[in-house]
Structure formats: C-alpha cells, structure tokens
Amino acid sequence: MPEPRSGARRPLSRRTALAATAAGLGGALTAGLAGCSTASGGTGGGVSLTFTWWGNDDRAARTKKAVRLFEKEHPGVTVRTSNAEFGAYKQKLATQAAGGGIPDVAQLDYRQISQYAGGGALLRLDEAFDKEQIRTAEMDPSFLRTGRYAGKQYAVPMGRGITGYAYDASVYKKAGVPAPGPGWTWQDFTDVNRRIAALGLTSPDGRPFTGSNDGGGNEDVFEDWLRGRGGRLYASQTRLGFTEDDLSEFWTFCDRLRKEGLVAAARDSTQAKSTETSPMGRGLAAADFTWDAPFPGYPALLGDAVHFAPVPTTGGHQGAYFKPSMLLGVGAHSAHPAQAVALVDFLLNDPRAGDILGFTRSTPPNRTIAARVATTLEGAEREIYDYAQTMEKYGLDAPPSAPPRGDVPVQIAFGRAYQRVMFEKATPRQAARELIDEAHRELRS
C-alpha cells in the first residue's frame, strides 16, 4: 500500500486552526456553501454544532468525552451530540436529509456516501484537504479515496476496518488442521471444514457441528472472493463489475458446502443477526466470517481460543482490502462549516482525542495515533491491530471508491436471493440471474 506523506505537523492551536479553517472555507468553498444560512446556531454570538453517530455505550461515552475536550479548546463553540443504534440512526439520518439537511457533523457508513453526496446533503471537503484544514499527512492516500464520490471528496474515514475469519483454535487442533493464515485458499477452507465435520461433534442442542457459517448470503464475502480473482463489485456508478457466471460459480460453491454438511444449515445462517446468534456463537460451527471491529465479541463469548485470520484466497491473491469502518461528513447546509471542519480534524488528528477514542471505531486512520494507542491494547484488541499490520505488509489492493447509490438495495437483494438457493427455491444460476436483473434496475433508477 502507498505510504503516507512524511512531515506530520504538530497539532494547531485552537485559534490558528479556527482562523485558518474559517478563512479557507469562507472563500474557497463558496460554491459548496451556496444557499447555506449564516445565522448563528448558538446564543450570545456563540456557535452551536450538532454531531451524531451510531454505536454502543462505550463509543458514546468516549466520543462525548472527546467532544468536551474540543469545546474546551474552542471557547464559544458548543456541540450538541446524539447517538442511536445503527438501524434507527440510518432511518433518522435519511429523514433529516429529506427534511432539509443532516447535522453539522455526521458519522456515515461507507454505503451511505454516494446516497448523501449524490443527493446534495454533504459538503465537499476538497478545499479543506488542500489547505490542510483537515490534515491527512498521516493517512494512506488510497484509503482516503473511499470518501470520494464522482471524483470529489465528501467524507473522511474515521476508522480502518478489514474483513476476516474468527476461528476456534481448539477445534482446529482437535481436527489436526493448521491454523488459517495469509495465503490460505478456498480449497484449504473446504478441506479444513471437511476435517472438522468428520470429528462428529455436536452442538449444545445435539445437532451436527460444522466448520463455519455459510458465507453465501454475505456480499462482503462475495466481494473478497471476487476481488481475489481480479474482479470487482461495481464497474461504475451504474454498472455491476461481475457477471452471472461469477455469481453462479460462487453460490454453487457455497451451496455444495452446505449440502455436504461442511458449513451451517440454512435456518442457522438466516437467524444470525449478531455474534451471539451466529452459528459460531450458538455452538454450531467452528468459525465465522466477520469484521475486525466486532471480532473481540467472539473471544468474549467463547473464550481465548478464538482467534482472527484472513478470509481465504484464490491462488494466494487476497481479495480483502481496508475499508472505512465509518466516516465523518459535514452537512452541506451547516451554518458553521468552518467549525464543523475543525471538529472533524480534531477527532481524527488530535493525539488527546485519539487516546480517548481508542479503537472504538476500529483502527484510527492516522498512523501515528494508531501506533500510539496500540501500545495500550491487550487481548483481542491487540490481535486485530497486529492482524491489520500483517495484512498491510501482505500487499492488499487499493480500496474502491464509495459504492454507488443503489448499493444498499443491491446488498439486501443479494442476501434475499441466496436464501432462495439455501431453501431450494432456486438454483444458483437462477438466483444469480434474478439478482443481476434486480441490481441493474436499482443502479439505473
């Protein structure tokens, strides 16, 4: 992966940061701010910002603590915060966007960038990048492009995540198979799961214990499989990057594994909504496809024998890439874009904010802050940091830009189509054809 530019700068004082940001955004981003109100959002001449995100209680407490530090460093600026669970958050943000504007600063999912940038809800940040009002010298340039839409920057990654494979090393040892590692293949995956199934173990409710969950309905797993073969999910904002043959081959592979009893049964995969309800969490499988951020939940639930490994490869070519666990964007209609940009920069680049936020949003994109915080990590959190370092040295392909606006309904349709395969309502070929037809309609609508 490209190395970040050298020459990291010291944190700016609050006066310097706000003065530089206000000057730059006041003039250079005039076009991006056209039509925005300039009235104060606070009282007595002060500035009031809104900042919203999704996440658990720990993330909320840490984020609020970092925001209070920002307020202390910027007298006259207050930040009203709010957070919710992901489903409710997505719905509320969509309602706000439709009603006139999202908050001054909003946490965004990778799949939301095209939706809100294309809909005019996000402020362009190119000028803020160019003038270092949002400092990026300690961030990977190829990773930053995940916040781009139509060639312009609309969001900044707040955490760097990567797909992986949680597995129970004690079961692998019992089966006499090696632990998965960089370069292991889908054929290895099949062989290992066959050995585990042959142990004849049973779940707590007496059903056969399998090698892993069924990744067939998971678009992230398919993307890793596809990229490992040189493909991609999207060729453009309106075109898929894969064919019916590609998807049919993947689903045929997954379907065969399930029918042979090597991966979890259909009903168990469809019931998986969390770590606890996954086949692995329920004692039905030895492994699970997941992301680095939620991985610590597996050893917390199942014990320290659970570790994190790469997703299988095709011929040793890794399809995984570093993806933003979430991003920060500024509302296009913010009355105080300068201060909103200053808050974004503070959360990403201030070492004290980095210490407070830690790895609550996965690995911080600022490499210096990530290395600093990593010295305090233990257990599963340290394992995912070391895993990310290993994968970076392994040589991953650059991440794609944000998915197109139709990606969310395509993702939902993907899981629904594979369920038809699992419950024998369609063949892999039929389901692939149906999914591609539906995806074309969504992308062109």
Q: What is each stretch, according to the model?
A:
Residues 293-296, 331-408, 429:
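Mature extracytoplasmic/periplasmic domains
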Residues 69-138, 173-176, 278-287, 441:
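Extracytoplasmic "Venus flytrap"/periplasmic binding protein-like
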Residues 72, 175, 259-263, 299-363, ...:
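Extracytoplasmic/periplasmic substrate-recognition and gating elements
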Residues 154-158, 163, 187-241, 285:
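Extracytoplasmic/periplasmic solute-binding protein
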Residues 111-162, 307-309, 377, 382:
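Hinge/lid segment of periplasmic solute-binding proteins
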Residues 193, 237-268:
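Glycine-centered hinge/linker elements that transmit conformational signals in sensory
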Residues 103-104, 135-171, 318-320, 394-404:
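A structural signal for short loop-to-beta-strand junctions that line the ligand-binding cleft
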Residues 2-5, 10, 173, 394-445:
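Conserved C-terminal helix/tail region of periplasmic/extracytoplasmic solute-binding proteins
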